[in-house]
Amino acid sequence: LEEKSRIIAIFNTNPEVLELVRDSLQQAGYQAVIAHIDDLKRGRLDMIQFVEEHKPDVIVYDVAPPYDTNWTFLRLMRNSKVMQGRAFVVTTTNKRALEELIGPNDVVELLCKPYDLQQIVDACTAAFEKQTKAKTKTA
């Protein structure tokens, strides 16, 4: 398996959080690209084109209120063909409310805010390691 730069896409509704998470991931040696979730949902930014252009291995997605519509958008996004084989790290402001909606098993990784940015870096690193093992088994 050739070593290539590890790319992470960050999807969030808060511009400040987008910048903070990007800075933390870049300091950890990752290449990070960002998109505002509202731009994706409203079609101002084409999600498929964004993913095809940047080819992220891991996607950090924040499920913000209203949880039901944002969770539904995440599920639709994850099921699209362009997302196959990509790992997701899911963040939220209210873990209990989200778990009541989806149950505890549907999420790759669920982190709560205010979160330690290192938790996101660690979750992305774990997602890459899981992905590498899966690709090695199928190769």
Spans of model-derived segments:
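C-terminal output helix
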Residues: 115-124
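The C-terminal output helix
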Residues: 125-139
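Alpha4 helix (beta4-alpha4-beta5 surface) of REC/receiver domains from two-component response regulators
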Residues: 69-72, 93-110, 122
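Conserved acidic carboxylate
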Residues: 11-12
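Two-component/phosphorelay signaling modules centered on CheY-like receiver
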Residues: 15-39
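Conserved phosphotransfer microenvironments
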Residues: 42-47, 57-79, 95
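Hydrophobic/aromatic residues positioned on beta-strands within the core alpha/beta folds
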Residues: 89-91
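Conserved phosphotransfer cores of two-component systems
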Residues: 52-54, 78-84, 105
